[in-house]
Amino acid sequence: EDFDSQCVPTADPGPCKAYIPMWWYNVLS
């Protein structure tokens, strides 16, 4: 998946800025 490549678990405001919180939510659940 390109998800990890484009939406890294950092505070970097990348192209997936809106997906960052969702990514963390998924990891923490």
Swiss-Prot record:
Function of the protein: Serine protease inhibitor. Inhibits trypsin, elastase, plasmin and kallikrein.
Protein's name in the database: Kunitz-type serine protease inhibitor RsTIQ7
InterPro entries in UniProt: Kunitz_BPTI_sf
Domain (BPTI/Kunitz inhibitor) ranges: 6-26
Species of provenance: Rhipicephalus sanguineus
Keywords: Disulfide bond, Protease inhibitor, Serine protease inhibitor
Single GO MF descriptor: serine-type endopeptidase inhibitor activity
Site entry: Reactive bond: K17, A18
